[in-house]
Amino acid sequence: LLFRGYKDMSFPPPPHGLLLAGGCSRRMGKDKSSIRYAGTTQPELAAELLRSRCAEIFLSLRKGQSNATGVENLNVVHDRRKSAGPLVGILSAMTEHPEAAWLVIACDLPFLDRITLDNLLAQRDPTKIATAYRSSHDGKPEPLCTIYEAHARLVLEDFFANDIRCPRKILMQTEPLLLDP
């Protein structure tokens, strides 16, 4: 069975990790990536979670943004488009590494843990556009703790071109694998 370059669908290659830290933090008034939780910054905590689970880890930043504190050693993907938002970061990473699936997490998820990520990876379905958790609050997809498969890029590009730039809305209109928390 061949599908998008994978020879054995039961063992897809590990995804790249993408830590989204390019937001402007307008509501918070300061860069979210500088906030400390349990003595360390959010990007440091998130990068540590991704380290043993991903082939490579990348930090997504907006154009002109300096690297986040504590993760200066990560590869950086700068937004390739003027438009803001997490979809731009995801598409920028997918454009730089089109063959890779991406485990995408936001930098401001202080309660994200290894069990949650391990379950997401164990349940991953590479034949779907994405594997995501379903929100326990409203049942909708949680797009910022999701594995986006490499073949999702063209679908995401199409939504972007049609001015649909909210990853949650995109997942609601496609058929990702949704996991219960």
Question: What is each model feature region?
Answer:
Residues L1-D8:
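N-terminal amphipathic/basic-hydrophobic helices that include classical n-h-c signal peptides
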Residues S10-P167, M172-P181:
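Nucleotide and nucleotide-moiety/phosphate-recognizing core
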